A protein has these predicted regions:
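Gly/Pro-enriched, hydrophobic low-complexity segments
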Residues: 115-190
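N-terminal leader/targeting segments and the immediate start of mature chains
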Residues: 13-48, 52-57, 82, 184-198
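Flexible, surface-exposed loop/linker segments and immediately adjacent secondary-structure boundaries
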Residues: 89-122
């Protein structure tokens, strides 16, 4: 009878171990992402570009669209239309623009589990699954993290189909990023039409 109970509880014990391992991997990844001098990540996949990150501040450039966020205000510049929108984005809006914010809020916004070790982009690492706690219930975010706790890739699936995928092609820490890099500089875009949505 005791053996039967132990077998019945086994999936819950494994799940608890996976959650502990996921927490360990994600926390160590956040330490890397939170470097006081900032990081630069170049990426490809559904979109190509690069991201500068320092705490919650970021600058994202994917060619046609550039976004600056200084921790309060966001500026989004569209090269095709020469328009810049200014807003105070919600946490959900920020996560859709800057995928690293998903990792920064994993404990509050997601249920998470450790999937296992794997090789991705030629590097050995970990796979962690994130599922939103509310809304977007069919969405699954797969995060691939290297053995040195640097993000390798992120994939968003919904109902068995891939919505987006980002592969990190270069990841550099200790970038000495100045705070001014996270604010739109109108003098560099003199023809831009400013649309203030705040």
């Amino acid at each position: 009878l005791l053996t039967l109970w132990m077998l019945a509880l086994l999936p819950y014990c494994i799940s608890a171990q996976n959650d502990a391992k996921a927490t360990e991997v994600l926390d160590k990844t956040l330490e890397v992402l939170s470097g006081e001098n900032g990081i630069r990540a170049d990426f490809g996949g559904t979109e190509n570009g690069f991201l500068l990150l320092k705490g919650e501040k970021f600058y994202l450039n994917n060619g046609n669209i550039q976004s600056w966020y200084d921790g309060e205000t966001q500026w989004s510049y569209v090269a095709d239309t020469e328009e810049v929108n200014i807003s105070h984005p919600t946490p959900e809006e920020l996560q859709s623009i800057n995928p690293y914010l998903i990792l920064m809020r994993y404990k509050t916004d997601f249920n998470y589990s450790y999937k296992g070790e794997l090789t991705r982009n030629g590097a050995k690492g970990h796979e962690v699954i994130l599922k939103p706690k509310r809304g977007r219930s069919a969405e699954i975010i797969r995060v691939f993290i290297s053995k040195t706790y640097q993000p390798l890739a992120m994939k968003v699936d919904q109902n068995g189909k891939t919505l987006s995928e980002i592969n990190i092609t270069s990841f550099r820490t200790d970038q000495h990023l100045e705070d001014g890099m996270f604010r739109f500089n109108k003098s560099l875009y003199p023809n831009a039409e400013v649309i203030d949505l705040r």
